[in-house]
Amino acid sequence: MKDKNLFEHIDKAVRSERLYADGELKREAIHKRFRISRHSLNDLLREHVGMTFPQYINSIRMEEACELMLHHKELSINEIAERVGLKAPNMRVLFKQMYGVTPMDYRQHRHVKE
């Protein structure tokens, strides 16, 4: 399988099977499942998304958290964090690092825009 196809295959599985939602997900699970070395997985991610494995998984988690905040207003931030495989304090820190605002501020700001 060519690198681009392999990356797309891995990315599709991580997203569609919600592998990112496993708070204990380790890169070993991915490289074993797709029968590639740890080094190859790292190279693949660097080449296609310019990220390390934790950065890649956390970016998907944050994308999903944004979607949940916008489309499921009944869910608390704690529930959203749990659904994306994080503890609420960790999600708040990651979210602020990635988007420059807290999840609550993001939700309130997006709600005002709609």
Predicted features, each with a name:
Residues K2-L6, F34, N58:
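Generic alpha-helical segment signature
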Residues L6, I10, M62-A65:
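Short alpha-helical "packing" element that flanks the helix-turn-helix/winged-helix DNA-binding module
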Residues D11-L25, L45, V49, C66-L75, ...:
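Basic, amphipathic alpha-helical hairpins
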Residues E28-Y56, A81-T102:
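Basic/polar phosphate-binding segments, predominantly the helix-turn-helix DNA-binding elements
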